[in-house]
Amino acid sequence: MKIFDCFLYNDENLILDIRFNTLSKFVYKFVIVESKFDHQGNEKKLNFKIENFKKFKDKIIYLIIEKFPEKLSNWERENFQRNYIVRGLTSANENDYVLVSDVDEIPNLSKITDLNNFKYTAFEQKIFYYKINLENKTNPFWFGSKICKKKYLKSPQ
């Protein structure tokens, strides 16, 4: 079983480092999508630097969106960027697993027992706001990261 961990990236180096170190023993490839534009359509610099993560270099598939289609709303730009993930799955076979989440949604993959019983699975995760030490105690859990076999993936969004 191979897992392709897929997410959007902006400038979250610390959380990305935590994600790589937490999930690398479970993940075959990390598919990272970054855009030259923010979700409002403003140009921005690319922030991902492979040299900051040399230890994981062979596991990283880094995709850059050069340009969004015209006349997209903010949400449509985000959806376009998330759907761009499929371009990084060309080496995945139909029975490999595709994990889709935000970079700061780090699932506990050691809890995976038997995914074959389900087409789709969502991970119940703790909610933190802005920083690792700001946990939501009122509503502490939500369903964040999702995983399925590539053959069942209709859209990463």
Where are these regions (language model features)?
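N-proximal low-complexity "stem/linker" segments adjacent to membrane-targeting elements
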Residues: M1-K25
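Conserved catalytic core of nucleotide-sugar-dependent glycosyltransferases
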Residues: E105-Q157
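Active-site-proximal specificity loops/subdomain of glycosyltransferases
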Residues: S35-V100, L109-S110
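Short loop->beta transition adjacent to catalytic acidic/histidine clusters or analogous donor-positioning motifs
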Residues: K2-F4, L23-D38, K57-I61
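Short, surface-exposed basic-aromatic patches at helix termini and helix-loop junctions that form
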Residues: R19-F26, T113-K119
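Short, glycine/acidic-rich beta->alpha junctions
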Residues: D11-I15, T22, Q81, N95, ...
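Short, solvent-exposed loop/turn segments at secondary-structure junctions
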Residues: N10-N13, K36-D38, K67-P69, D104-I106, ...
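Conserved acidic residues
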Residues: I3, Y28, D96, D104, ...
